[in-house]
Amino acid sequence: MMLRVSPSPAAAVPTQLSGAPATPAPVVRVAAPRGVASPSAGAACRAAGKGKEVLSGVVFQPFEEIKGELALVPQSPDKSLARHKFVDDCEAALNEQINVEYNASYAYHSLFAYFDRDNVALKGFAKFFKESSDEEREHAEKLMEYQNKRGGRVRLQSIVTPLTEFDHPEKGDALYAMELALALEKLVNEKLHNLHGVATRCNDPQLTDFIESEFLEEQGEAINKISKYVAQLRRVGKGHGVWHFDQMLLEEEA
C-alpha cells in the first residue's frame, strides 16, 4: 500500500514569480509498514451496518482452502469422484424406490396384457395401462440416473410376479382393475414420501428438491386422475357403459 507524503514545509515553498502560476508540491509515494492500513483503506473494508468492525477484505482464498479438502477427491479407481454429502441411507432408499417403480411398471404391464386379450378386447384400457407401465419404468430410469449423478451405486432387486387375471364377479374387470391402479398409485406415493423423509432426516436438500420437483406433484395428479376414473366406472356398472368408457380412454391423449 502506498501513502502520499508531502515534503517539509520549507521544501514545499516554490519560488513565486510575478504573474506565474504556482508550482504544485511534489508527491512522494512510500510503502506503508506491514500490517498498517491507511484510514481510507480501513473505511473501504468496514462492515456494512454499524461500521465498527474492520474486515480483512479477503472473502475466499480457494487454493489455500482446498489444501485441506483434497481428501474429498478419492484416489481409488473404484470410488466415485462425484460423490459429496450423499450418505449410505439415501443411496439405499433410492435403490428401494427404483425397485418400487419397476414393480409398479410390471404390474401395469400385466394389466395391459389382460385387457389386450382377444376375449377381453378393451383396447382403451390396454392403452392406458401400457402408458402407465412405460411411465413407471421411466421413473425408475430417472431415479437410476440420479443415483449415478450423485455417485451412488444402482443395485437392482427382485421384481414380484404380478397378477394375471383381473375379472371380478361383482365389480367386473374394468372397475376392479382401475381400483387396483388407484391403490398402486397411492402405494407409490407413500413410498416417495418415505424416500423424502430419509432425505430430510439425512439433511440432503438436493435429494429432497429432486423428489419434490420430479415426482410428488406428478404423483398427486395421477392419483386424482385415476380417482375420477374409479368414480365414473362405479356409475356405469359392468354393462354397455364400460365399452363407452373404453372408447374414451382409446381417444384420450397420453
From Swiss-Prot:
Domain of life of the source: Eukaryota
Residues where Fe cation 1 binds: E101, E136, H139
Catalytic EC class: oxidoreductase
UniProt keyword Transit peptide present: yes
Keyword Acyltransferase set for record: no
BP GO terms, sorted: intracellular iron ion homeostasis; iron ion transport
InterPro entries in the record: Ferritin, Ferritin-like, Ferritin-like_diiron, Ferritin-like_SF, Ferritin_CS, Ferritin_DPS_dom
Annotated transit peptide: 1-46
Covalent S-S links between cysteines: none
Region (Extension peptide (EP)) residue spans: 47-83
Tissue expression remark: Ferritins accumulate in seed during maturation. Then, they are degraded during the first days of germination. Present in roots and leaves after iron treatment.
Stored Gene3D superfamilies: 1.20.1260.10
Stretches assigned to the Ferritin-like diiron domain: 84-237
Any GO CC annotation of this UniProt entry: chloroplast
Induction per the UniProt record: By iron.
Localisation: Plastid, Chloroplast; Plastid
Annotated positions binding Fe cation 2: E136, E185, Q219
Function: Stores iron in a soluble, non-toxic, readily available form. Important for iron homeostasis. Has ferroxidase activity. Iron is taken up in the ferrous form and deposited as ferric hydroxides after oxidation.
Protein family membership: Belongs to the ferritin family.
Quaternary structure, from the entry: Oligomer of 24 subunits. There are two types of subunits: L (light) chain and H (heavy) chain. The major chain can be light or heavy, depending on the species and tissue type. The functional molecule forms a roughly spherical shell with a diameter of 12 nm and contains a central cavity into which the insoluble mineral iron core is deposited.
Protein name stated in the entry: Ferritin-1, chloroplastic
Lineage: Eukaryota, Viridiplantae, Streptophyta, Embryophyta, Tracheophyta
The gene coding this protein: FER1
